Amino acid sequence: MAAGPPSSVRAERVLRAACAAMAAAGALLLGFSAQTKTVLFIQKKAVPKDVQALWVLIVAAAAAAAYHVAQLARCFCMERLAITGGGGGCRRLGRAVACASFLLDKGCAYMVFATTVAALQACFVGLLGVDALQWSKLCNIYTRFCEQAAAGMVCSLLAAAGMAVLSAFSARDLFRRPCSPEYR
């Protein structure tokens, strides 16, 4: 009877799936948030493209979700190769994949965190207004839009935190692999 994967591999899978789900939820909540209001006989629609930082966050969160789904598939494929015995002679390839995974995990975490913080900063103007520039508080008018945007950004922040933990998993995986003899 074959034993299942180690608990660290299971934890990485669960965390990757959670990060993919949270990033996708953030992108979907932000992407489908829109609200139309009539102000002084003029209909005005609030959409994420009105705030450039929100649009960038949607793209970044969707790309991060796709990346983590691909990494999850890689985890399952590597386990399948290890079970069938087909991956025995590719240590250098395994180290290269671990290095690429580490760098991409770090980059993905930084990208999602940076775009989320930029979107939060841009949305605080809509939430609080700027008296010096006579910008009104838009969230008093577009309440549902602001609530959906806030939920999307919370999902993206949770995904970024999970991605930071995943980069620690990737670092552990990379530095546990032995170097090839010619580099020692």
Swiss-Prot record:
One GO cellular component term, please give it. plasma membrane
Q: Which UniProt keywords apply?
A: Cell membrane, Membrane, Transmembrane, Transmembrane helix
One Pfam family linked to the record = CASP_dom
Subcellular localization: Cell membrane
Superkingdom of the source species: Eukaryota
Keyword Transmembrane recorded: yes
Q: What topology does the record note for this protein and the membrane? A: Multi-pass membrane protein
The reply to whether Transmembrane figures as a keyword in the UniProt entry is yes
| Cytoplasmic topological domain | 1-13, 74-109, 170-184
Locate the transmembrane regions by residue number.
Answer: 14-34, 53-73, 110-130, 149-169
Record-linked PANTHER family: CASP-LIKE PROTEIN 2C1-RELATED, CASP-LIKE PROTEIN 4A4
Subunit structure as annotated in this protein's UniProt entry: Homodimer and heterodimers.
Q: Which family does it belong to?
A: Belongs to the Casparian strip membrane proteins (CASP) family.
Name of the protein described by the UniProt record: CASP-like protein 2C4
Query: Which organism is this entry from?
Result: Zea mays (Maize)
